[in-house]
């Protein structure tokens, strides 16, 4: 009998960023994984990881489902606490997924800054000796 991969999916952002883009990315990227990986058990986090309490609850959910791997999508900029906490508590590899930045127009702000966050998070995970 073939064993099914249990993939934990979570979208993150730091609380000071607007939440509309992270919510959109959570639906879009979570839906993409479910549609394109039918042979995988995609365990979608019950909430977006934007606070310590939310991350604790997500870890418990992922432990209950015995996830083998985590895919973390940057809904917007996320400090290195989220990726570090997930990998330390779950002890599974993590895929850091930084979507393209929303088009930037003069006199407005960045809405995600995901690539910057992903690079910073990868450096932190490397220092911790975690697989990403």
Label for each model-derived stretch:
Residues 1-132:
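An N-terminal assembly and electron-transfer interface module characteristic of large anaerobic redox
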